[in-house]
Amino acid sequence: KADLGKGNEYTFAVALDRTACREGHIEIVGAGPGDPDLISIRGRQMLEKADLILYAGSLVPKELTLCAKAGATVRSSADMNLEEQFALMKEFYDKGLFVVRLHTGDPCIYGAIQEQMNYFDQYGMDYHITPGISSFQAAAAALYSQFTIPEKVQTIILTRGEGRTPMPEKEQLHKLAQSQSTMCIFLSAG
């Protein structure tokens, strides 16, 4: 019963359709820089409730998946192509289950999520992104360093060196360095 004012009480009835199925959901989770202690609280919560955890086995430590609930499917994507990954996620999604796609670092920085989001959008699949701590942040902490210093440098450039994927001409490292900003260079060891 609810009182809608002026002493009038009303009773509301709610009917639930037992045949209705729960909609699936996909959570793209940033695993952080590799230390299981550095995953976000929300990221860990998503892992704990997932029915499927699909993680980048060549990059994400398996220890991050140890918090999976009993009965959850935990699978490395290292030996899967994109079509196989999508098929597995869609299979769980179509059953109304909760899927976590676990990526390294922050999935929005040099991640491979754009193709996945395009796929999810194409099939009308509900998804969300849980950011992660990026390796550049962990590196600063490990080095007891600060990337910005008042009146010295207030800009941070996140970039990568040229490799198999060429850099746009205007983003060549020597041109970016001319700004004398702090530069965090990803994917360039070796």
Predicted features along the sequence, with ranges:
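Short, acidic/polar
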Residues: 37-42, 169
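Class I S-adenosyl-L-methionine
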Residues: 1, 13-30, 41-133, 138
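Generic anion/oxyanion-binding catalytic loop in active/binding sites
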Residues: 32-36, 105, 181
